[in-house]
């Protein structure tokens, strides 16, 4: 069982801040109104490739700023939140956001980008009973602020946004209200999203994604044992190491990049790609991350019998402020006094003050549902030397994707499972 949750937060206010909604609560629009489309959405594969490009660009910046640390984030959560902000932007502010998300505006009209996101989010919401994927946008708005009706309608119809009013003059009460909401929506996995509120906050945009999946071939918790995980050539830590024998699963050995790629499938429409660089080669693999690399790995996967597969049981959580990272990707003006977010309220006195992203990734034999391993028998045979062993006992990468829309839900690097 794997559980993953991520939250993206945009702090907003007048001068130091961003979005707003009128008084009252706006519910999610559950229907996808195809008959109201006046354009053509970006097709799923094109959007997936663009999102992958953004995901790897963001990953490289995070890895640069957080060397030798665990990394986990949801590129889809971040890109969807930025796309929503772009609905309120104009001129250079708008161009920077969409180009920072890796869209070519000479090839793809702005309206088509949002239709593509709407279709993607709708497809992800159609998860089956064996998997759980919840992705949603919620806005908490200062009760005295008003926004343009056109912006309000676009956010609602394109991104199914749910909005609430809050009194940010009572900062502690507003923070508790938001934290309680997030705790409930993530089933208690994110306990405290906000530790404080930026001064003069007028809006908090929360974009969250929650994924819970069962392995098609679960690990047997009875054979999970403490084992060495090598942080580098000189240091190691003891971690709970899961094991599975006689597993047939998609596998590819990339000799060019000196890494092994193993795909483990979830029941339903999701899979996890584990990339294990050879000792000392993780930086080489990270530098090569681009849509073409991921496509090569996926196209090269072939069913392979692995006699022994070892994978650490781990829980990784991260907390990022993304303003500097996004600025490195060209998204700068929205954080400055020059920001033009006049499609939100009709004035230019808004800017984004803070972008916070929290994510949690848990990989285990099974989750809270004991049925994950029901009916699965493992045969342990003695007296035979395994012909192939894959041991994730050093830093590795993990890509969780939705196979139906070919989009990356989560991207992670595990440098220390503890």
UniProtKB/Swiss-Prot annotation:
InterPro entries: Serpin_CS (IPR023795), Serpin_dom (IPR023796), Serpin_fam (IPR000215), Serpin_sf (IPR036186), Serpin_sf_1 (IPR042178), Serpin_sf_2 (IPR042185)
Subcellular location: Secreted
Pfam families: Serpin (PF00079)
UniProt-listed CDD domains: serpinA3_A1AC
GO MF annotation terms: serine-type endopeptidase inhibitor activity
Cellular component GO terms, alphabetical: extracellular space
Taxonomy, superkingdom: Eukaryota
Site (Reactive bond): 381-382
SMART domains referenced in this protein's UniProt entry, alphabetically: SERPIN (SM00093)
Signal peptide range: 1-28
Keyword annotations from UniProtKB, A to Z: Glycoprotein, Protease inhibitor, Secreted, Serine protease inhibitor, Signal
Entry-listed glycosylation sites: 23, 38, 104, 269
Membrane-spanning intervals of the chain: none
Similarity comment: Belongs to the serpin family.
Protein name: Serine proteinase inhibitor 2.4
């Amino acid at each position: 069982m794997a559980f993953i949750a991520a939250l993206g937060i945009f702090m907003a206010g007048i001068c130091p801040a961003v979005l707003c909604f009128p008084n009252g609560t706006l519910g999610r629009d559950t229907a996808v109104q195809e008959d109201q489309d006046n354009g053509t959405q970006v097709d799923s594969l094109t959007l997936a490739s663009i999102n992958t490009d953004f995901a790897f660009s963001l990953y490289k910046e995070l890895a640069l700023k957080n060397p030798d640390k665990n990394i986990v984030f949801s590129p889809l959560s971040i890109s969807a939140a930025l796309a929503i902000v772009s609905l309120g932007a104009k001129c250079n502010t708008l161009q920077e956001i969409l180009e920072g998300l890796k869209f070519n505006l000479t090839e793809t009209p702005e309206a088509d980008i949002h239709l593509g996101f709407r279709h993607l989010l709708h497809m992800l919401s159609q998860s089956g009973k064996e998997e759980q994927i919840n992705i949603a946008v919620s806005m908490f708005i200062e009760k005295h602020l008003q926004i343009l009706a056109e912006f309000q309608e676009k956010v609602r119809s394109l991104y199914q946004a749910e909005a609430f009013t809050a009194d940010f003059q009572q900062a502690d009460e507003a923070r508790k209200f938001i934290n309680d909401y997030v705790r409930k929506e993530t089933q208690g996995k994110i306990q405290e999203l906000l530790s404080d509120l930026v001064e003069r906050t007028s809006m908090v945009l929360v974009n969250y994604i929650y994924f819970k999946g069962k392995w098609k071939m679960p690990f047997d918790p009875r054979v999970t044992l403490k084992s060495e995980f090598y942080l580098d050539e000189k240091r190691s830590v003891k971690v709970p190491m899961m094991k599975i024998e006689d597993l047939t699963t998609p596998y590819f050995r990339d000799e060019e990049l000196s890494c092994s790629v193993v795909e483990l499938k979830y029941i339903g429409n999701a899979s996890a790609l584990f990339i294990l660089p050879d000792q000392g080669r993780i930086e080489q693999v990270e530098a090569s991350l681009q849509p073409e690399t991921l496509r090569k790995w996926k196209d090269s996967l072939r069913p392979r019998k692995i006699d022994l597969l070892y994978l650490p049981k781990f829980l990784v959580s991260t907390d990022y402020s993304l303003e500097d990272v996004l600025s490195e990707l060209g998204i700068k003006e929205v954080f400055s006094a020059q920001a033009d977010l006049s499609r939100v309220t009709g004035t230019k006195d808004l800017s984004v003050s803070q972008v916070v992203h929290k994510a949690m990734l848990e990989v285990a034999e099974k989750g809270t549902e004991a049925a994950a391993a029901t009916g699965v028998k493992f045969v342990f045979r003695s007296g035979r030397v395994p012909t192939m062993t894959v041991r994730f006992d050093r830093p590795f990468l993990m890509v969780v994707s939705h196979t139906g829309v070919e989009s990356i839900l989560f991207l992670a690097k595990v440098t220390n499972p503890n």
